[in-house]
A protein has these predicted regions:
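Extracytoplasmic/periplasmic soluble domains downstream of a signal peptide or transmembrane helix
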Residues: 1-132
Length: 132
């Protein structure tokens, strides 16, 4: 199944909760990552909380589903393709050295399907947290 990058934050913590998963194989948990669109919700459940993250704007789209995105995150796109060595996508503020002031979820998987030539990255921002 999916696994958390060991140097990333835990779900709901300030910074970047980064998770890698396969697009093929048993269960293929991230097979449909490419279907996520701007403002789609991604729900993460822990033992004590249900955390909703929302996919950031893709390709410069307008995102009325956010109450403003902080300037430190204005460069972060909801979905893009990068190289396997681009570890900056898992930084506390993705692709930046800025200090985090929001909770971010980053999902990474191989791209294209059945290849490890590139990585598909999805970034989402926390919008709701509820106790179970």
């Amino acid at each position: 199944g999916p696994g958390r990058y060991v140097d990333s934050q835990m779900p709901g913590e300030m910074g970047n909760f980064a998770v890698a998963g396969h697009r093929v194989g048993k269960g293929a948990p991230f097979n449909d990552l490419g279907k996520l669109e701007t403002c789609d919700d991604i729900v993460v459940e822990t033992q004590t909380e249900r955390i909703t993250y929302r996919v950031l704007p893709i390709d410069g789209e307008q995102a009325d589903c956010f109450n403003g995105i902080p300037p430190e995150y204005s460069h972060v796109v909801g979905r893009h393709i990068t190289t396997p060595g681009d570890v900056s996508v898992t930084n506390p503020v993705p692709e930046s050295d800025a200090a985090p002031n929001r909770e971010i979820l980053t999902l990474t998987t191989c791209h294209p399907q059945f290849s490890n030539a590139e990585r598909m990255i999805v970034h989402a921002m926390e919008v709701e947290k509820e106790e179970k």
